[in-house]
Each structure stands twice: as structure tokens, then as C-alpha cells.
Amino acid sequence: MSIEQTLDELKQQLNYHAYRYYVEDSPELPDAEYDRMMQELLSIESEHPELVTVDSPSQRVGGEALDGFTQIQHEIPMLSLDNAFSDEELEAFEKRMNDRLISKPVSLFCCEPKLDGLAVSLLYVNGKLVQAGTRGDGTTGENITENVRTIRCIPLTLQGEGWPTRLEVRGEVFMPKAGFEALNERALKRGEKPFANPRNAAAGSLRQLDSKITATRPLSFYAYSVGVIEGGELETSHYQRFVQLKSWGLPMCEETKQCYSLTEVKAYYKDILKRRDALKYEIDGVVIKVDDIALQEQLGFVARAPRWAIAYKFPAQEELTVLNDVEFQVGRTGAITPVAKLEPVFVGGVTVSNATLHNADEIARLGVHIGDTVIIRRAGDVIPQIVSVVEARRPTDSKAIVYPTHCPVCGSNLERVEGEAVTRCGAGLVCQAQRKEALKHFVSRKALDVDGLGDKVVEQLVDKEMVETPADLFKLSAGVLTVLERMGPKSAQNVVDALNKAKATTLPRFLYSLGIREVGEATAANLAAHFYTLEAIQVATFEQLIEVSDVGDIVAKHVLNFFAEPHNKTVIDDLQEMGIHWPEIKALDESVPQPLAGKVVVLTGTLHKLKRNEAKAALQELGAKVTGSVSKKTDILFAGEAAGSKLAKAEELGVEVMNEEQLIELLN
């Protein structure tokens, strides 16, 4: 199996399990297995940086917004943390930072337990809580303001004085152990299904569409950082910022502590690990941050995490259970994934009943049989893997796992390309399983974004043989849709309206919706920007394709193969006949100068005549690089009303400042 193929499979697996974990709150793997897969992906990408794509799980923070909530945009991305699993990895983290800082090594850390809950953002304007949101995918989250207002420890109005006019507080909503146990006891008495663990209970409670239900749940909150700060200043120490937040009525974890060396950090980790079971809440490690805010800003961020913080995870927890069966699932690209069906076992705070077996090679490596007693590990405390077989306990009636030769859904022959570990069904949309996944992808938020056409609706449409190709979706009428479960006339008409609305799209979205292997959002955008038209992409040669940013040999081959397939050409023609269209992309006139080419600019404050995202896009068209913070590298700060601390910092650094009127004049 080639490196590229290994990466491709890892991305598919990580994206699938991230969706199960972050969106459906129904993980199939222990954290340990997910972390292992992510570490493998990060290791390969570290050794082969040319293979890193914008759509890699390493470049994003997992989790999409649910359809039931309105969405919010995070002004400053809410990133996740990189993980360490040993003292050596912690020491490497410190070395990486000091190598970047050179002149001033890190000498003070702020440490706190890593709570196992749901990350949220609280926005206070003039001391009033005006908005609360989930982390979502890091840039877009769910608006859960009404639910958060029911959490009694979160102040609706800040106490004291001195808080900024706009202050974003970030933290973790969680359910204490005692509250979780009481909640499950009540559920059992009512004959209801109990929650598997406090994290799922917290997430499920916070994402209730009815805030009255949330109000009955024993939720709590600890602040762990700040985001937007405008119209005021905070302390320059991370720990002292906690003290400030506490003085304003925001709860902080009592175990938070400053450590003056890595030796003290290690001692703190061991102490928390020792006292873990005695704590009032579930944790899966400790978070270590550089305490000096100036050093944090100097160190900056990578794509998915800050360079100045790391989560030191606790060791994996293991349990014995029995492998009852193996199911073979079919993914969007035809990849066959064997899923172990386990005797449910409580390990690391989660009841585990499924685990991935990856592929035939992994099954052979483990030598696992149906009926075997196996060791399940949850590394990092949340996602499961079978690490070994207890052969001494193998029953006499155990059965060897027989890998299928035909697709378990459509019956087509399975193929395994030499050098690949993955077995695939090559039937494409003829295969019902692939058809379902392809259609789900086609209508997803980042593709054609068809509101109301969720996974369950798509599955019904395929099961009832109402659609075969994406173009068939646009032939559906409200009357036809009403035969589906839970689809009344109004909902059916809303779906038809959403489908009609989705016909007006963009070339990047359309390319992404086609589900070409390895072509994520960024690659689709790069292809569109390079070739301008779909026709040009369809006839592009291998040599032309690899000239596109982020397109290497493997992606180029996938694109060529996709457009060489007659069936795919037919699907595209049918979609265009159904009215799918997009605006023309105009080639950049290189004779027209870009006045902001190479300039680093920042937008801050309230704009009255422009929307912030429109202003950002317009500035980028003029060649500017738009960033979220002011530094010595900033060339221009565009300041709206109540610009706050960014304006003060720009003036201190001598950065050019323009108001909204000057911004509009420049854009015109």
C-alpha cells in the first residue's frame, strides 16, 4: 500500500469517526483508536508535507453544526489541541516552542484538568450575555444561547467592573459525576434509556431544541480561555486572566495551577492522574499552556491547534470483552470496512459495542475469530480498538472471519488494488450503499447545501428506489415526497424549494459535490480558480492538473479517472439539464494592479455599511491577507465603531489605521 493510499484511507476513517463523535454523539471507536489513527496521519504528513491537503483531518477541527440550530460564525477560530501521550512527547512540545522563541524560553506554564464535555463560546457585550455557541467545526458553530442561559453557574450579567465592552469567554460545559448518576437513576425509574457517559449526557442536554429540557439537567461550566477582546484590556498572564474572569463571576476549575518548570508540570500531571477518580467530574488528561500571553501570540497557531498549548492525555484504559460478530460496511468510495460487533463493555467512561477492524490485513495481524475474548483499549479515554486476542480463552466453536468476495450490499465483485490494504466495491452508484453516501455528500452543507434533505430522508429515497443519481433529486415533487416517513406537505414543499434554491451554486461547490476522491473543498476551489470552467477541468491533462495548487500525482489521477468515466459525464450533463448553474469565473487581468497585494490587514469593530465577511472577501480580491490579530507584521487596521484593544495596539505599534469610510473608498 502506497503512502498516498494509506493517507487516503486514514482520512476517510478519521472523517467518518469524527462525524460519529462530534455530530451524532455516537462514537463507534474508543478515543485511543481515533488518536492512534490521527497520530499515524500526522506522522505521515510530517514526513511527507507535500501530501498535506487542506481537507485533511489534521487541518480542521472536527464537528459540523446540526440542522436544528441556527449557526454562528466564530470571529476567532475555536481550535482543538494537539495531544501528548508520554513525557518524551511533552518534552518535544517544550523544545519546539523554545526553538521558535530562541531568545526567551518558556519558564511558566498554566495547567488545568482536561474536562470531558462540550466546548462553548460565551459572548458578553457591555457585561450582558448576548450569545452562546458550540465549537462546531471551529469556524461555524450552533447557536445555543437559550440553552446556556439555563446553566445556573454561568452569569447572565458580569459582576464587578473593568470588563471589556465585548468579551468572548470560552470554556467547557460538563455534567458532574453526581449529577450524571442522578440523571440516569431518574431515567431508569421512568423506563427510559440511560446516557452512556457524562460527556454524552452534557452534549445531549446542551443540544436540546427545547431549552426547558436543558434547564432540568445538572450542567456546569468552567472557563478556560478568552477569544474576542474589544473595548478593554485583560491581564498578560493566562492564569491571571482566570483570576480576572473569576472576579467577574465566571467559574474556573479549582485545580488550575501555575507550574514554573516542565518538572513541575510532570508532577502536576501525576498528581491529577492519581486523584482522577476522586474529582467531581470526568477528565481525560491535563492541558498545559504557556502562561505568558505575549509568548502565546509570538508562537501562534498551526492549522488545527495552538503551538503554545497541548493536551497530555492519560494512559489508555483497557477491558476484556467478546467479539460477537463482524459486519462489513460500504463507504462512499466503495471502501469495505469490517466493524467488530462486541459484547457491550464499560471502558474509560463509555459503553463500547463497536470497533473498527480497518481491513483484511488488520484482521490477519490480530488473528481474531468470532467468539474470541479480546482486549479493548480506549487511548486518550474516548474511542475503542481491539489490541489483541486472549487465545487461551478461545471457545471451541469460534469461527474464522471470512472476508467477503462480493459487496455485502449490491453483490458486485470486490477488488483490492495491489499495494492497497482496502478492498473496494467498484459498482459506484449502482451499489445502494455507495449511492446513499454519494447523495448525502452531494446535498451536504459544504456541497450543494440542500436544507431539509438529511441523511434519513436520503436513505428512504434510495431504499424506496425513488432516486438513483443526483439529478433524480431535482425531479422530486412535494406530492411524491409525502410518502416518506415524517414528511408532511409543508416539509415536502420546503425540500422542493431548497432543491430549487440549490440549483444556483458555485463551480467549487459543484466540483466538491461530485465526490471525486481526494477533492475536498480547498482542492475544488483551487481547480475552479485555475481552470475557470468545468469544461476546461474535464479535458485537462495530467500535466495541466498537477500545475494546480495542492494537486499532486494521486489527486490528478483521481480527477482524470473521474471525468474519463462515461457514467460520471452523464450525471454531470443531467444535472446541468436540470438547471444546475453557477456564475462565470473571470480570469484575473494581470495588467490591473492589486493595490493591497502582499499587505497584511486586520478588520475590527462594528461596520455599519458593510458586512464583515463581504469586506474580508473584497480585501482578499485586492490581494490582501486578512488576519485576526494585530502585530508588527500588520500593514493596515480597518477600524469600525468600538474598535477596542486592536486599535490601541495598532496605534502603539504605529500601524496605519483606516475607518469604514476609507475602507469603502478603497474598495470602490
Swiss-Prot record:
Matching entries from Gene3D superfamilies are given as:
5' to 3' exonuclease, C-terminal subdomain (1.10.150.20), 6.20.10.30, BRCT domain (3.40.50.10190), DNA ligase/mRNA capping enzyme (3.30.470.30), Helix hairpin bin (1.10.287.610), Nucleic acid-binding proteins (2.40.50.140)
PROSITE patterns given in the database record:
BRCT, DNA_LIGASE_N1, DNA_LIGASE_N2
Q: Which GO terms describe its biological process?
A: DNA repair; DNA replication
- The record places domain BRCT at 591-668
Alphabetically sorted, this entry's keywords are: DNA damage, DNA repair, DNA replication, Ligase, Magnesium, Manganese, Metal-binding, NAD, Zinc
- PANTHER family assigned to the protein according to its UniProt record, in alphabetical order: CHROMOSOME TRANSMISSION FIDELITY FACTOR 18, DNA LIGASE
Please give the NCBIfam families that the UniProt record associates with this protein.
dnlj (TIGR00575), PRK07956.1 (NF005932)
Give the protein's biological function: DNA ligase that catalyzes the formation of phosphodiester linkages between 5'-phosphoryl and 3'-hydroxyl groups in double-stranded DNA using NAD as a coenzyme and as the energy source for the reaction. It is essential for DNA replication and repair of damaged DNA.
Please state what class of enzyme this protein is. Answer: ligase
Q: Which cofactor does it need?
A: Mg(2+); Mn(2+)
Q: Which residues bind Zn(2+)?
A: 407, 410, 425, 431
Q: What is this protein called?
A: DNA ligase
- Which organism's genome codes for this protein? Aliivibrio fischeri (strain MJ11)
What does the record give as EC number?
6.5.1.2
Write out the similarity annotation.
Belongs to the NAD-dependent DNA ligase family. LigA subfamily.
A GO CC annotation recorded here is: cytosol
Write out the residues that bind NAD(+). 31-35, 80-81, 112, 135, 172, 289, 313
**What reaction gets catalysed by this protein?**
NAD(+) + (deoxyribonucleotide)n-3'-hydroxyl + 5'-phospho-(deoxyribonucleotide)m = (deoxyribonucleotide)n+m + AMP + beta-nicotinamide D-nucleotide
Q: Name one GO molecular function term.
A: DNA ligase (NAD+) activity
Supply the HAMAP family for this chain.
Answer: DNA_ligase_A
- Active-site residues from the entry: 114 (n6-amp-lysine intermediate)
